[in-house]
Amino acid sequence: VLAAGTLGSTEILLRSRDQGLAVSDRVGKRFSANGDIIAFGYGAKSIVNSVGVGYPPRIEGLEIGASVTGQLEFRDAQNLDHELTIQEGAVPSAVAPSLPVMFLPNGRLLGALQSLVSGVYKGPFASLQTYFAVSHDTASGTFRLDGDKLALAWKDAQNEPCYARLDEALRSVVESAGGDYVKNPLAGTVMGHQPATAHPLGG
């Protein structure tokens, strides 16, 4: 049994192959990001209080609750690849101070500045809703060894069809609550518009 995680196990197998171990020619192929996306509903009509307060709490009187308590499932009996799941989430307290800065490049300047002054537990960030979604990508990622490091190649990963379907579904959910749909702020700044995943699979 090789249990070093998706990336670690693939790296061990690729290194072993280069040292003469007979392995399948599929090792390193068909990596999937699980069609994951993180997104936000900004400025909704209702107060959400989904930003963690830490312990001891930074602010009294807010009950944040668990990270995921609700889920929407979109089924498609004709095409399973089009199925997707959306969960609501909470932002950890450690991330709270950086939230306004994350949203500055995303056209939310006024609200971000307001929360920089008054904190994320008041103003527009009090109605910020976090969404985690999973779907089906084409599993087109390929791993290889680049010198001494594992490298991933996936042409046009950001243009996978599943992300457009997720955008459409999430936008509908967010707008029905009176908010504005905001994609993962870090994807466009820190990550160069590449997708992120919490569930690396295959390879």
State each model region's role.
Residues 2-59:
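Glycine-rich loop(s) and the adjacent beta-strand/alpha-helix scaffold that form part
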Residues 3, 15-16, 34, 136, ...:
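Generic, well-ordered alpha-helical scaffold segments in large soluble proteins
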Residues 27, 35-36, 127-129, 201-202:
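Residues that flank catalytic or metal-binding motifs in active/ligand-binding sites
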Residues 28-32, 120-124, 194-197:
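Short Gly/Pro-enriched turn/cap motifs at secondary-structure boundaries
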Residues 71-132:
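Alpha-helical membrane-targeting segments
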Residues 129-132, 150-203:
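A glycine-rich dinucleotide-binding beta-alpha-beta segment and adjacent secondary-structure elements
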Residues 135-142:
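Active-site beta-strand/loop architecture of penicillin-binding DD-peptidases
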Residues 145-149:
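Short acidic-glycine loop/turn motifs at beta-strand connectors
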